[in-house]
Curated annotation (Swiss-Prot):
Top enzyme class: oxidoreductase
Annotated binding of FMN, by residue: 17-19, 72, 141, 202-204, 226-227
Gene from which this protein is expressed: dus
Function: Catalyzes the synthesis of 5,6-dihydrouridine (D), a modified base found in the D-loop of most tRNAs, via the reduction of the C5-C6 double bond in target uridines.
Enzyme Commission number: 1.3.1.-
Keyword Flavoprotein listed: yes
An example molecular function term from Gene Ontology annotations: tRNA dihydrouridine synthase activity
Reactions the enzyme catalyzes: a 5,6-dihydrouridine in tRNA + NAD(+) = a uridine in tRNA + NADH + H(+); a 5,6-dihydrouridine in tRNA + NADP(+) = a uridine in tRNA + NADPH + H(+)
Keywords: Flavoprotein, FMN, NADP, Oxidoreductase, RNA-binding, tRNA processing, tRNA-binding
Cofactor names: FMN
Family stated for the protein in its record: Belongs to the Dus family.
Active-site residues, as the UniProt record annotates them: 102
Name of the protein described by the UniProt record: Probable tRNA-dihydrouridine synthase
InterPro entries in the record: Aldolase_TIM (IPR013785), DUS-like_FMN-bd (IPR035587), DUS_fam (IPR001269), DusB-like (IPR004652), tRNA-dHydroUridine_Synthase_C (IPR024036), tRNA_hU_synthase_CS (IPR018517)
Length: 327
């Protein structure tokens, strides 16, 4: 089983940090489906130390379980990242994850995210400053490198491990690929062979078969699932079950899915309030219903609704109609 410092994960299937997706309520939900670790949305370190409302909301954690209290920080200033890490530790975080992988132009333009892979000296300073600032484990998520000519993830992983970082996650693409092409799980094996700390494979893990293939090709200690959980938070438990038993675990029934969605919807509204919560919930509703009969009409209707009670009633009505059609 994977250990991050003194924290042992119950599963080697991890939920990836995703901006505007892995908020507190979504992490709670996926954790209930057996994720070994759930990671917060990326938080800008400078905004964190300024205690901006958005950053404080993003760093909210579940205090009863260390594997539910991992906060991801982004930035390019070692002292600022270190201060933000200490601040999160003081608020209860049990793991700090450093973002060296985000390919977004806005992030890279600020010399953060995957741009850090182009400056190994700066990366070293960030690793060392963060590890020194906190007593909790520090991990890092990166890509293979900036482009095909600079695939330096193995080198950066060695630097990270030497600096005291205790786990490395590698997305099997370069920054310049963004999300095009296929994730190169074979390359992750090179990273795994370069360090003794746990290495996690990430990228294109959307079903049972791909999860197994990613582990086999990468030799990684575990896998991190990202976009595959859109509308399927239960995928984490299905993958974990398949990797353990070799058998496929069926998805929840439509009735069970309705219960999951309603509880998730209620949690979003309670956490964010009505005016903010409904727009946030919409994207999840769209993903949940994707592929179901008449879902296009349902999604169009929900997109025009702002009253939280009406939206909830529409969800129930739609799923009941799907159940009736399946009788």
């Amino acid at each position: 089983m994977i250990k991050i410092g003194n924290i042992e994960l119950s599963s080697n299937v991890i939920l990836a940090p995703m901006s505007n997706i892995t908020d507190l309520e979504f992490r709670k939900l996926v954790k209930r489906f057996g994720a070994g670790l759930v990671v917060s949305e990326m938080i800008a370190s400078r905004a964190m130390i300024m205690k901006s409302r958005q950053s404080m909301q993003k760093c909210a954690i579940m205090h009863d379980d260390p594997t539910s209290a991992c906060v991801q920080l982004a930035g390019c200033e070692p002292d600022v990242i270190a201060d933000a890490a200490k601040m999160n530790e003081d608020m209860g975080a049990k793991i700090i994850d450093l973002n060296f992988g985000c390919p977004a132009k806005k992030v890279v333009g600020g010399y953060a995210g995957s741009a850090l892979m182009r400056d190994e000296r700066l990366a070293t300073k960030i690793f060392e400053a963060t590890v020194k600032a906190v007593k909790i484990p520090v991990t890092v998520k990166m890509r293979m490198g900036w482009d095909d000519n600079t695939k330096n993830a193995p080198t950066l992983a060695v630097i990270a491990a030497s600096s005291g970082v205790q786990m490395v996650t590698v997305h099997g693409r370069t920054r310049c690929q963004f999300y095009s092409g296929n994730a190169n799980w074979d390359f992750i094996r090179v990273v795994k062979e370069a360090v003794k700390i746990p290495v996690i494979a990430n990228g294109d893990i959307t079903n049972f078969a791909k999860a197994k293939e990613a582990l086999q090709k990468s030799g990684a200690d575990g896998i991190m699932v990202g976009r595959g959980v859109y509308g399927k938070p239960w995928l984490i438990s299905q993958i974990a079950y398949y990797l353990k038993t070799g058998k496929e675990k069926p998805a929840p029934s439509i009735a069970e899915q309705l219960d999951i969605i309603i509880k998730h919807y209620d949690a979003i509204i309670d956490y964010y309030g009505k005016s903010v919560g409904v727009p946030i919930a919409r994207k999840h509703i769209i993903w949940y219903s994707s592929g179901l009969p008449s879902s296009a009409e349902f999604r169009c209707a929900v997109n025009l609704m702002n009253d939280p009670i009406a939206v909830k009633e529409k969800i129930a009505e739609f799923y009941m109609s799907v159940m009736d059609a399946n009788k």
